[in-house]
Amino acid sequence: MKMRGEKRRDKVNPKSSQRKLNWIPSFPTYDYFNQVTLQLLDGFMITLSTDGVIICVAENISSLLGHLPAEIVGKKLLSLLPDEEKDEVYQKIILKFPLLNSETHIEFCCHLKRGNVEHGDSSAYENVKFIVNVRDICNEFPVVFSGLFSSHLCADFAACVPQEDRLYLVGNVCILRTQLLQQLYTSKAVSDEAVLTQDSDEEPFVGELSSSQGQRGHTSMKAVYVEPAAAAAAAAISDDQIDIAEVEQYGPQENVHMFVDSDSTYCSSTVFLDTMPESPALSLQDFRGEPEVNPLYRADPVDLEFSVDQVDSVDQEGPMDQQDPENPVAPLDQAGLMDPVDPEDSVDLGAAGASAQPLQPSSPVAYDIISQELELMKKLKEQLEERTWLLHDAIQNQQNALELMMDHLQKQPNTLRHVVIPDLQSSEAVPKKQQKQHAGQVKRPLPHPKDVKCFCGLSLSNSLKNTGELQEPCVAFNQQQLVQQEQHLKEQQRQLREQLQQLREQRKVQKQKKMQEKKKLQEQKMQEKKKLQEQRRQKKKKLQERKKWQGQMLQKEPEEEQQKQQLQEQPLKHNVIVGNERVQICLQNPRDVSVPLCNHPVRFLQAQPIVPVQRAAEQQPSGFYQDENCGQQEDESQSFYPEAYQGPPVNQLPLIDTSNSEAISSSSIPQFPITSDSTISTLETPQDYIRLWQELSDSLGPVVQVNTWSCDEQGTLHGQPTYHQVQVSEVGVEGPPDPQAFQGPAAYQPDQMRSAEQTRLMPAEQRDSNKPC
């Protein structure tokens, strides 16, 4: 026991074992006491900062987790934890100021990473529990932090270090192990060093064992070695299935060795002769198990009454057997019945009893057995008589059943007939033999009662054999039917499996088709969506274009209105050519009179202006010619003159804009304002034109021809002042014009003639003087 204590002490603190050989329960320091106690509990001491940095750790961490203290100091605790537990542990460690009393004690469980994992293996973790308290380095300096700092630094820390840096988490880390024994006995060294020990009251029992402290774990373990023979016996007892079992019973009685065959359970009881059943209801199999006569039967005295009764019963059975030819007894079988009987059986009863006494010593057990067997024999006599009749009835019933089976088999195919036909021949031969046997039995003398008993027993056995032979073809036929049914069932199962496979394949094909249809529908939907989006985009573009066009139109409308107003307000300037001189005439364009600008010339008289003449839609006569100004130009000015008054042609200048030229005024051409007078009637017929020409023929002066631009051309001037060029033909032409002189070209219709109200230049006085009487 002392050696085991030394081994444990070596594991706990190797340094102390070198100094002291005897273990003394004394602790030099508080840290040492904590280290020893924690090592017994599979734990170690740790010191953490408020940030989770490991400040100090005990040396026994290397034996528990495989980390060296120098390597682990300075690391953060969160680096040794799995990723799933980092947030939870950080919330536990962090301190919130001001601290409450309940927050100074912290407990939590987590998993720490092991350090002695082999290269290439995955990281292993140990389930540990932290039990730490918040400590102030200044208040508990000599007790807790004596190994970290010197004593003279206590005052300096209290003065200069803030409160957050003075607080540390000091406590213990215990490893929670659940399967320690399994780890101990996996190694060979541990299994070889198993020692039978017994725990004493002096040493406490440690419940939790560490895998690293192997010998300390053996103090509480007991290795028990069992002999192979005892183990085999125990295994035999625990096993429920035993093929052969040898059972012996010790005592004054006889030793009986039995071999019991069993599939599931075995019987371990001894069989005694006095345990025979006493009830008369015995089955047929009990008698078939005794082919020979027991010698005890020969010792009983012969009863004359029994023999006489037995003879009478045999005489009665004789005629019954003759009527029933199916009694399965042959003369050879009868001769065989008497063969096993020795001549010694006919010895007197006294000699038989004397010979039985040395074999069976005088004891109460032997007498009881003999008396019980005698009673059984009496009861067997009665049962044999009854069962002979029952057997005859059973044989008849079986024959009827066989006939039905034959009828049924004849309907079946011929392949099955060879199984039944030999049995029929044997069954037909049996009744003939039975008839001969019964006839011989009646003629013979009455046999001995013992022979009668043997005869009855063998007749029963032979009848049972015959019934068994008759049942064999039925069993064979039933077996064939069962085989056929099994084959049919197998075929049905195979067909069902094939159908299931086909259904599965069809389902797979249907699923694939459905998936393809779904994909097609999705593609169609996507295409329709794209088309709708394109249509919407086009509609949006069209709407935007319409809006832009409307905006432009709205912007152009006020500009056009302004241009029209400017054109109406500006005075009309005309360039008039009189002879070879050009005269610019400025005509005021009042707002109340609309003067349209057309591509048709307007004639002015030198003395008096005339009303504009509308052209008739008739063909030009041959007596007149058409004078064209600039025949190849786009805007052609047309004038009609009579041939009589036609003078030499005048070279007319092209119609150009002379807005930059200086204004020239002439007194020979009076300027008349344009006034609107509704009293002037329009000339609708050629006669009106002739009449007007005749009235004005006396005062006919030089004709003034005015060329104007069209309305479209005026719109392109963009606000420039409009001028009318007026050309005056030669003066001095006399003679009234022909009535057809005012006939316009055929291209102009009467409805297109313009009113003379637009270019009235005649003053009111001249108009009154020229009116016809």
Curated annotation (Swiss-Prot):
Residue ranges annotated for the PAS domain, each copy included: 30-102
Region feature Necessary for transcriptional repression, mapped onto this chain: 365-412
Gene3D superfamilies: PAS domain
The keyword Phosphoprotein is assigned to this record: no
Basic and acidic residues: bias regions: 506-536
Alphabetized UniProt keyword annotations: Biological rhythms, Coiled coil, Nucleus
Subunit structure: Interacts with the CLOCK-BMAL1 heterodimer; this interaction inhibits CLOCK-BMAL1 transcriptional activation and suppress circadian timekeeping. Interacts with BMAL1.
Name of protein: Circadian clock protein PASD1
Taxonomic source organism: Homo sapiens (Human)
Organism lineage string: Eukaryota, Metazoa, Chordata, Craniata, Vertebrata
